[in-house]
């Protein structure tokens, strides 16, 4: 529900990073994003919206996606960036940090925003000065909750969630429920005790993101969102806002093959080494 306030319309910047992304998936992403922006404009919440699309596979595959983002109604400025190499997730997003925006949306191309998602998220950030980032309520395409907000993990949580078979995860279901904040995630009220936010959809105050320098360049893939969350919480809160809804058609590194498992493990070790090991 939009608050009754007289805030000046804001500038929203948005970035998404592609890597051999499915065409139909990107088209759905685009259409949902444009509808959510339309809702913002209909309520006169934004004065300007910019979108930057970074195609990390352009150096390998050529230009396969730029045509999807031409003539977008509601977008004031569009940049389609094709790096000469695959920069990884965080570094690619950091190419677009120098924005003069009020709020910045980091969004995966496999995330589909609800029509009122941006209205809800921006309204929350404007009315909560102590909050630097909001994270949404997410489900998969079958409507199953994804628990995108988390508490700081232990190594055991990390191993169970990333690599354990279903029968073993079931044995530790209570433990994983605490890590995934089921108690807060299934409530109807916003929660400001989030310690880790998923990088698939992050809505932040731009000045704070710039102060942090964006994502750490030390993570090529995975855990850059964990690292950013920990650093951000030194300055502001992260809020889970259940009325800000998305569908996320992705994740599950352990199901994507050995290269992804190695990247996941490498980044996990870096994260714990940098921010503290909690074993159990």
Per-segment meaning from a language model:
Residues 21-42:
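Short, well-formed alpha-helical segments that are part of the catalytic scaffolds
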Residues 52-66:
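A conserved acidic beta->alpha catalytic loop
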Residues 82-100:
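Glycine-rich, basic loop-to-helix element that forms the pyrophosphate-binding segment
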Residues 104:
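Short aromatic/hydrophobic "clamp" motif used to bind/position activated sugar donors
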Residues 114-148:
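Conserved donor NDP-sugar-binding/catalytic core segment of glycosyltransferases
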Residues 153-194:
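Short, flexible, basic/aromatic active-site loop/helix in glycosyltransferases
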Residues 186-214, 218-245:
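A short, conserved alpha-helix in the catalytic core of glycosyltransferases
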Residues 226-280:
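Active-site-adjacent helix/loop segment of glycosyltransferases
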């Amino acid at each position: 529900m939009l608050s009754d306030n007289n805030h000046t319309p804001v500038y929203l910047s948005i970035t998404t990073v592609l890597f051999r992304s499915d065409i139909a998936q990107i088209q759905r992403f685009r259409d949902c994003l444009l509808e959510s922006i339309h809702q913002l404009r209909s309520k006169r919440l934004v004065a300007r919206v910019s979108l930057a699309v970074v195609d990390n596979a352009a150096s390998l595959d050529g230009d396969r996606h730029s045509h999807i983002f031409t003539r977008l109604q509601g977008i004031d400025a569009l940049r389609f960036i094709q790096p000469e190499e695959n920069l990884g997730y965080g570094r690619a997003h950091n190419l677009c940090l120098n924005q003069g925006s009020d709020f910045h949306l980091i969004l995966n191309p496999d995330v589909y925003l609800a029509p009122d998602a941006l209205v809800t998220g921006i309204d929350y950030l404007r009315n909560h000065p102590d909050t630097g980032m909001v994270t949404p309520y997410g489900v998969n395409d079958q409507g199953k909750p994804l628990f995108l907000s988390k508490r700081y993990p232990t190594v055991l949580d990390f191993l169970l969630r990333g690599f354990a078979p279903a029968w073993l995860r079931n044995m530790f279901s209570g433990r994983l429920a605490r890590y995934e904040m089921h108690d807060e995630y299934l409530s109807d009220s916003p929660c400001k005790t989030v310690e880790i936010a998923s990088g698939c959809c992050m809505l932040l105050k731009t000045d704070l993101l710039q102060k942090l320098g964006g994502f750490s360049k030390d993570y090529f893939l995975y855990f850059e969102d964990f690292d950013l969350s920990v650093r951000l919480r030194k300055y502001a809160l992260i809020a889970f806002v259940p009325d800000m809804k998305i569908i996320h058609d992705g994740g599950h590194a352990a199901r994507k093959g050995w290269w992804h498992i190695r990247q996941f493990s490498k980044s996990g070790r870096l994260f714990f080494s940098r921010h503290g090991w909690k074993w159990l």
